[in-house]
Amino acid sequence: MNPRSYLIAFVLVLSTACQEPLAVRPGSGNWMSGQRVAGPGGVSEITVMTQNLYVGADVDLVIRALGTPDPGDDFPALQFAIETVGKTDFPARVQAIAAEIARRGPHAVGLQEVSRINIDLRPLGVPLVVDQDFLALLQAALAERGLNYQVAATSDNINVSLVGGLVRLVDHDALLVDASRVTVNAASGQAFSVNLGQVAPGVTLIRGWVFARTTIDGRAVTFASAHPEANLAGAPVGLLEQIRAAQVGEMVARVGGGDERVVLMGDLNDVEGSPMYAVLAGAGYTDTWRAMHPGTEGLTCCHRADLSDQVGSFDQRIDYVWTRGFARDNGTIQGSIDRFGAVPADRLTGPAYAIWPSDHAGLVAVLR
């Protein structure tokens, strides 16, 4: 993306951030009104999990190669990414993630980088075919464990089509709920209004979020999960920070206020002290990790792209569980929040070496 395009995107961010929240009409694509049940008592404990599934390779390397004037580096970068996808073996990793869901039993699971990868290089004389649907693989792994997690909502995000369509990647966000315990009253997935858009030939960066208004044991709980824009080599950091703040601000405005319990989770791609963080804190949300683990870093990102590091090499905390409406009268949040995929014992057997379940740690929070 050239400097002029970044400037246009920045103006769009500012204009969106300054607008009043849009009124949403019943029947529109973003209609989020659901029955709000305020039964007596209420559920004593709600468990949630957020996990970036990880596409399996460093896609930024491919984007950077496509963005250079030298076409000679495009295919080597793509070939390296495909080889890395094989080494990071999502069909094996999904078993570990499904096992963690089975062990912890969350009411809702927010998922990011839920990828659909379709590669067929046989027309080029290369005997390589990859066909992976991350969501279908996860649902199958959960069903094998006797679990009934249903897809409440998905959003369509990054879309990549290369080599004349022989290489395709579509990225989604998804929200799963345990259908045996959670009633979904309304749900939706949508793209954010502000996005980077096309950043290289065949590569369009769109980010989105998903939500569900639910009833659990007679009490209303809203779950939302998001994956705002990530840092991208060559893009101004300040612009990306403002894009993330605008994206999260849009989500907060459309979830709405009130006394209803809300859990907002995901790979939010920014750290404490960022504009994104300020938007959530200013809207009355509580950073659950910080509330329950004051003074503890709780880093969540990132393992090496090939997942080969023997000890976690995290250097930032960008995965979160934020809550509203769960605080006690004294302002405290009761429960627990832990990481998954952060210690060597979480690794599993890969095709060539031990690998991590994802390049991000997952979070599991129990809210009382």
Question: What is each model feature region?
Answer:
Residues M1-L7:
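Bacterial N-terminal signal peptides that target proteins for export
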Residues L14-A17:
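C-terminal motif of bacterial Sec signal peptides marking the signal peptidase cleavage site
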Residues Q19-R36, R181-S188, A253-V263, L268-R368:
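Metal-dependent phosphoester-hydrolase catalytic domains
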Residues Q19-V163, A245-V248, V366-R368:
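N-terminal, active-site-proximal structural segment of metallo-dependent hydrolase catalytic domains
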Residues G29-W31, L142-A143, V151-V221, S225, ...:
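A well-ordered secondary-structure block
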Residues I46-L53, R93, I97-L124, L176, ...:
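Active-site beta-strand/loop signature of hydrolases that rely on acidic residues for catalysis
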Residues L53-A57, V114-N118, D156-V160, R181-V182, ...:
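Solvent-exposed loop/turn segments at secondary-structure junctions
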Residues F80-K87, Q190-P201, P228-E241:
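Surface-exposed cleft-lining segments at the edges of enzyme active sites
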